[in-house]
Amino acid sequence: MVAPAFRVERLPRPLIFVLVTVLCVAGLAAAHGSRIVDNWHVTQWEDGVFFRYNVEQIHSLGDCFVKRGAWAGLYRPLTTNLYYYVVSQALANRIEAYHLINLVFVILNAVLLYRLAESFLGPWWAMIPAVLFASRLAMVEVVLHTCEFQGLLYVFFTILSVDLFVRSRKSDSSWPLTLSALAFWMALFSKESAIVLPALLIVYGWLFEDRIVSRRYLVHPGIAILWVILFVLVLRPLSHDQPTGFGYDFSVSNVLRNYTAHFLDFSNWFLAPLQDYVMPANVAALADTWHARLLFCVLITSEIAMLLFPGFLKTQGVRLAVFGFAWFLITTLPFAIFEGRLFMRYSYLGHAGLALCVGGLLESVVRVFFARRGKTETRADAIADVSLKPPLAR
């Protein structure tokens, strides 16, 4: 692999993670620093809803799991009831404490993405996805609103589950796979959108492993099926089968528009200067144009073609780019089918995939550039060597 002269892998592992953390903090500060300062003592309206519900309804640890959350139809005990109950008991609902927890998890998730990317790219190139993930303007609500801990924790457990699953391939112990399964359970109890994780692992196996028909690949689909049964028979009745209030539109036009908008809002250039925290009008308008949708259709078609013929993907970086875009498509799907809920915060986990995609593409481009330059220099040296020899020696 081509790498800069300074070799990060020579540093002690703890120091590497310190360096990555510093870079991610710098990226977060560059993107949201002034907004974080201005918002430090602010309680957003939905935060207040959770505070009041917790005070009125949740009086013990048991209540956290047997009572529904503030919003009907959803079961997220770890990130709604339990989270607010524990923090309220320990820190008396100080809004600054909640803001600090959000910031810690934003950085933690980026560092965790680094750990995953390192398995594919090595310690130097893996920094690119991590810093990109920490510095997206689109996650402004995730950074500023404490109620978005739901997204932060489910993203944490989802990335952790993928990372442990990837590492279980080279481990003689069953612990990585067991912990990956446990992390998947935790992700599901943080936010239902984690249900798509098994599809993500299957794509990983298709691209990076020789075979995906093995017991390892049955664990997470089995958990997903068990969770669906549990949700329908036990958890939904906690809300008396009340609807979530979400509308769904499965039309190709709606899904394609939502996908395109979530893809475009990965770019800070499209969002700056950031004024609308939900979804800037210019991004929504661009996603609604035929040429933007056509371009995204081309990307999806290319992705499908590369997944069908992975043998043509010769380098690890290219395969990671394909995996990253598939990650975006899979993890954004639960939100792409929403009607009238085009929110940038729904892009959060999908942007981790796009960050991996960018990292893989950059590594591949640099690899090709240096490989070609090396061949050119070798050829030039050979010609020069021949030209310097005396005629009788040629």
Regions from the language model: what does each represent?
Residues 2-394:
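Polytopic membrane enzymes that build or remodel cell-surface glycoconjugates and lipids
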